[in-house]
A protein has these predicted regions:
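TPR alpha-solenoid repeat register
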Residues: 89, 123, 156-159, 193, ...
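Structural marker of alpha-solenoid helical repeat scaffolds
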Residues: 48, 82, 116-117, 150-152, ...
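Canonical tetratricopeptide repeat
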Residues: 58, 92-95, 126, 160-162, ...
Length: 261
């Protein structure tokens, strides 16, 4: 299945839109510059705290995107003082922990966020994706199932794509195909689902179908080393040595530091 770095793109994307309950005028915090809110003297303290919390997480997510982990962590921890049990802050903190190599702390924060938000499909999907990255694909499926059952989950196809890829890792081929095809029915260009379907078809010896999915994957998003390697293997099995070599040449050109790994 797609390696963890590609799953993380899906996982991190879900963190950048922070849902805020109980404050309709500030329903989402988005990454990017933001103006300081103007408060009325009649604003209750709880509203000011909530808006401050939201702004801190937006700024932290922006810092995290550009790799400024120290600043991101400071802002998230300040936000957590305002709302210690807010799952969105815990997810961002988990992402920072993961990037810093603090794997145990990352897992604890992802799990705590999921337990605090059992009806938030995005939070549940995040924890499932993290478990799969850590080599626990069977356990991850439990959390993907919960995400898919969450009411009002707007990006369920992403959880289906993750679930399908992780089911493939767990050796559950029938479930993998079911979830991946469901994801592609909604998001035909989902790169996680396309690459996983290429891998599934390859494992089943369906090399023409694997080629079709690999080509769709490469057209849908920037190529990664793993998908180029898979495409090369598919072409080799189909007897097209020239095409196989072209993919290997792309690896050498586009991923020179990884070409020999």
């Amino acid at each position: 299945m797609p390696r963890p770095d590609r799953l993380w793109l899906v996982l991190f994307a879900g963190v950048l839109a922070v849902s805020v309950g109980g404050c309709k005028s500030h329903s989402k915090a988005k990454v990017g510059p933001s103006m300081a809110p103007v408060y009325s003297v009649r604003d209750p303290d709880s509203v000011r705290r909530q808006v401050r919390w939201q702004d801190l997480l937006a700024l932290a997510a922006r810092d995290m995107q550009v790799g400024n982990l120290d600043a991101a962590e400071r802002k998230v921890r300040e936000a957590q003082k305002l709302a210690p049990d807010a799952p969105d802050g815990l997810v961002l903190l988990a992402g920072i922990d993961e990037r810093r190599g603090r794997i145990q702390q990352a897992g604890e924060n992802f799990r705590r966020a999921a337990e605090l938000a059992p009806q938030r499909g995005d939070i549940l999907n995040n924890y499932g994706a993290w478990l799969c990255q850590q080599g626990q694909p069977a356990e991850s499926l439990i959390w993907f199932d919960r995400a898919l059952q969450a009411p009002g989950y707007a990006t369920a196809a992403e959880a289906q794509a993750n679930a399908g890829g992780c089911a493939l890792d767990a050796g559950q081929f029938e479930r993998a195909e079911r979830d991946l095809r469901a994801a592609l029915a909604t998001l035909p260009g989902n790169p996680v689902a396309l690459e996983a379907m290429a891998q599934l078809s390859f494992r089943r010896g369906q090399f023409l179908e694997a080629r079709a999915f690999a080509e769709r994957r490469i057209a849908a998003a920037p190529a990664t080393r793993s998908v180029l390697q898979l495409a090369s293997q598919i072409e080799a099995r189909l007897g097209d040595r020239a095409a196989s070599d072209r993919y290997l040449q792309r690896i050498r050109q586009e991923f020179p530091q990884e070409a020999g790994s």
